[in-house]
């Protein structure tokens, strides 16, 4: 696909796609709760539709009228053995969180996905779930999918210190803990996104959070709720960066989720001197509008506790750094290696093709800026965030064309991405 290049400026207002993390979890919580859950503004991207299909295969009645999704939950006990292997597609969230839910179901389930999922490590989830009493293993005697899990109705609580900062692992353990008799304790390596904890409370559950320690006493019965999904800051990030680096630009992004465990990119932009203003903030629902304007940027260092708050935004932050004055260092981001692709290598290789001065390290990137970008042939590696990052990079190309292989990957989280960009382009 030939990408849009040499854009003079970007102007306009966008409603970014609904939050992917909350959309996944809204289906999951609806399925394991008793009663009806209605979901408005659900993200109909490929990953979240994989979650919806997975729970239908477990016997959950889910209706979608195109506007609202209705989940008729019957609690954990209402989940039934799937007739076939559950296909999670490209979704790591689906497979890892479902393992936590299935840990308490007294039947065997097999989960598989695409080629990318088949390279994603699962021991980080399987080990604690096996400690709780589930029988979870790779079908091919490795830690990689396909995964087979046989749950038990006698799950034991766990006291677990996490070796990696992962909201997916934490969430899987919490889903299992909801079904275990007794108090489970999870200690995070670093604070990660807390949508699961918030939604446990929203659906009538209880847990205690003390810094990086989470305590949950089970078993608990949840009750169906009405969920309104805000816009996804991870999708907004591409247009935040575009608005900062394309000359004479001003973009208003409406109803963006502003959960503090997800807003690390806003802190980085501020540190780099970028102009992003929060308008119409709704503190109760953690959302607001974001107004971004073209800015002069300076380099920064990114590492430590902020990394889990922006892990998915690091590819587009790397592009931002190519347009900042000085040397930007990203460290402590080794988790990028086990995303849809090795994002450290992918970002470095593809931006180098376009003329960036960027070097991969074991746990991040070193980026010298500012640099002018030029045309070239690049690939998304089938990774939606790499694909969208490269299109934003192409906007800055003044000479030559940019050809993107595997552009269709963006539909995983943002099916209307190219259309939305076209509406803003001048």
UniProtKB/Swiss-Prot annotation:
It is found in: Cytoplasm. It comes from the Bacteria. GO terms for cellular component: cytoplasm. Phosphoenolpyruvate binds at residues 20, 92, 120, 168, 343, 385. Catalyzes the transfer of the enolpyruvyl moiety of phosphoenolpyruvate (PEP) to the 5-hydroxyl of shikimate-3-phosphate (S3P) to produce enolpyruvyl shikimate-3-phosphate and inorganic phosphate. Monomer. This is 3-phosphoshikimate 1-carboxyvinyltransferase. It comes from Enterococcus faecalis (strain ATCC 47077 / OG1RF).
């Amino acid at each position: 696909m030939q990408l849009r290049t040499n854009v003079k400026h970007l102007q306009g207002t966008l409603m970014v796609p609904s939050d992917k993390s909350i959309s996944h979890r809204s289906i999951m919580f609806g399925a394991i709760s008793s009663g009806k859950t209605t979901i408005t503004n659900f993200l109909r991207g490929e990953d979240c539709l994989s979650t919806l299909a997975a729970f239908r295969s477990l016997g959950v009645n889910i209706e979608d009228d195109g506007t609202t999704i209705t989940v008729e939950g019957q609690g954990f006990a209402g989940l039934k053995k799937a007739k076939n292997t559950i296909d999670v597609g490209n979704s790591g969230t689906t497979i890892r969180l479902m393992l936590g839910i299935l840990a308490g179901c007294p039947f065997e389930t097999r989960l598989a996905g695409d080629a990318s999922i088949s390279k994603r490590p699962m021991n980080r989830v399987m080990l604690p779930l096996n400690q709780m009493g589930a029988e979870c293993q790779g079908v091919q005697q490795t830690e990689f999918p396909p995964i087979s899990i046989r749950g038990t109705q006698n799950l034991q609580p766990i006291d677990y210190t996490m070796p990696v900062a992962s909201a997916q692992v934490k969430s899987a353990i919490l889903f299992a803990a909801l079904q275990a008799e007794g108090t489970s304790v999870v200690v995070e390596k670093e604070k990660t996104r807390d949508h699961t904890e918030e939604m446990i409370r929203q659906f009538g559950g209880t847990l205690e959070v003390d810094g990086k320690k989470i305590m949950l006493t089970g078993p608990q019965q949840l009750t169906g709720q009405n969920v309104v999904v805000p816009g996804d800051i991870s999708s907004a990030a591409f247009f935040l960066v575009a608005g900062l680096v394309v000359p004479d630009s001003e973009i208003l992004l409406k109803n963006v989720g502003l959960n503090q465990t997800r807003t690390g990119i806003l802190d980085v932009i501020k540190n780099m001197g970028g102009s992003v203003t929060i308008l119409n903030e709704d503190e109760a629902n953690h959302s607001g509008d974001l107004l971004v304007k073209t800015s002069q940027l300076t380099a920064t260092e990114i590492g430590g506790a902020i990394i889990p708050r922006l892990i998915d935004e690091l590819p587009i932050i790397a592009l931002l750094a190519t347009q900042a004055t000085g040397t930007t260092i990203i460290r402590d981001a080794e988790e990028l290696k086990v995303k849809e692709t090795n994002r450290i290598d992918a970002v470095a290789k593809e931006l180098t093709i376009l003329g960036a001065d960027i070097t991969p390290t074991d746990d991040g990137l070193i980026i010298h800026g500012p640099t002018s970008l030029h045309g070239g042939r690049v690939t998304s590696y089938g990774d939606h965030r790499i694909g969208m990052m490269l299109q934003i990079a192409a906007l800055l190309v003044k000479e030559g064309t940019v050809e993107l292989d595997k552009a269709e990957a963006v539909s995983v989280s943002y099916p209307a991405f190219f259309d939305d960009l076209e509406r803003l382009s001048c």
